[in-house]
Amino acid sequence: MSYHINSSQNRFHKIITTEQLNQVIEAITDGRYSWACVLILRFVGYNPLHFIPQRTYSRLMKDNRQVANIPGSLNNGKSISANSPITNSSVVNKASTQDLNQSNNSDYLTTPEPDKRGNIPGYLETKMAVMYSRNQ
């Protein structure tokens, strides 16, 4: 007896790009689960307001926009001490102007962190790479 997998899985891989998937994974590894849900809904073409309350959506948008509002002088190569009022992750997550110009939707602002790859288990990272290399 064989089981036929619905073709919606193939469409899923064409809807969400590798870059978008990385943004969702980054949000999850940062503990921002609600933001990850908003990103997924947007990437597959749904309006997040049809699924979550307006107040929650507004708060998520505000929180994730503040990441990009950090002054540029803070991210000029100087290290920030642990006692600094601005957390290190907020500085690292600051999106550059170039990233914003390339983005189709400027409502989300994230930049991949080089050290965040350590939070994704190696076996998961390998499987994701294999999965996307087959479907593209």
Curated annotation (Swiss-Prot):
Subunit architecture: In bacterial two-hybrid assays interacts robustly with HetR and Alr3234 and weakly with itself, HetP and Asl1930.
Protein name from the UniProt record: HetP-like commitment protein Alr2902
UniProt signal peptide: none
GO BP: heterocyst development
Source organism: Nostoc sp. (strain PCC 7120 / SAG 25.82 / UTEX 2576)
Polar residues composition-biased segments: 94-109
Origin superkingdom: Bacteria
Entry comment, domain topic: The N-terminus (residues 1-68) complements a hetP deletion for heterocyst formation but only partially restores nitrogenase activity; it partially bypasses the requirement for heterocyst differentiation master regulator hetR.
Family the entry assigns: Belongs to the HetP family.
